[in-house]
């Protein structure tokens, strides 16, 4: 099972949140789980890292596989965005991760479960 870890959990981990560290440890020890992140969410973490965090950030991200954004994912994300933005205020990045999980059968681990209201997407609150 692909475990897509949302950027919020990655950032919490980098900022020293013990609950985020426990979640990542649990997922990495689960033989049925593969650590993944979406390309856009990886970019969010890399683009906004603090200079002092660079080594730790790149080390953390090296444990994850990164799913590319394909035309099919973008098209599905557009449909999610148009459907869910007016009522739930989801942003483009969240729509792309939801479409990525839908396309690959993955689960999304996040603290922001309200960003993923799609009924057919498996979303798990990190802690």
For each feature predicted by the language model, list its residue ranges:
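Histidine- and aromatic-rich ligand-binding microenvironments
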Residues: 6, 37-38, 90-91, 112-113
């Amino acid at each position: 099972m692909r475990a897509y870890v949302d950027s919020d959990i990655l950032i919490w981990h980098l900022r020293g949140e013990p609950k985020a560290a426990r979640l990542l440890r649990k997922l990495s020890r689960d033989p049925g789980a593969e650590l993944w992140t979406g390309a856009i969410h990886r970019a969010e973490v890399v683009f906004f890292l603090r200079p002092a965090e660079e080594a730790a950030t790149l080390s953390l991200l090296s444990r994850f596989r990164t799913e590319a954004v394909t035309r099919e994912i973008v098209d599905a994300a557009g449909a999610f965005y148009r459907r869910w933005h007016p009522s739930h205020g989801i942003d483009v990045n969240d729509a792309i991760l939801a479409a990525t999980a839908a396309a690959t059968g993955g689960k999304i681990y996040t603290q922001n479960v309200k960003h993923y209201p799609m009924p057919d997407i498996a979303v798990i609150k990190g802690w």
